[in-house]
């Protein structure tokens, strides 16, 4: 999990650079508000609107057993999330 905090960052948003965790969160319905490619040009950060559910989802992604219902996701939703994130990642503007 890659959550970096600085004095300028807003607690309303969750930033993560892990592509597949971001795809999981997006497929689970979290709102993607930006893809930050400026802060670190070598590594984009996906910016989500933060919610109490987000912390639970990240924990489920990282620590539950792979066949746990908490970590399960419809394959089509996950593929669509990956496609959408890749589209947004390679767009010049969000």
What kind of region is each of these model predictions?
Residues 9, 14, 57-94:
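C-terminal basic regulatory modules in eukaryotic proteins
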Residues 37-40, 89:
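Conserved phosphate/metal-binding and DNA-contacting active-site motifs used
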């Amino acid at each position: 999990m890659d959550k970096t905090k600085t004095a300028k960052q807003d607690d309303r948003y969750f930033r993560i650079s892990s592509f597949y965790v971001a795809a999981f969160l997006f497929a689970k319905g979290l709102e993607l508000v930006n893809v930050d490619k400026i802060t670190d040009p070598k590594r984009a950060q996906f910016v989500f609107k933060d919610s109490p559910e987000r912390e639970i989802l990240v924990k489920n992604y990282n620590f539950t057993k792979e066949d746990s219902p908490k970590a399960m996701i419809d394959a089509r939703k996950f593929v669509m999330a990956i496609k959408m994130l890749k589209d947004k990642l390679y767009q010049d503007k969000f």
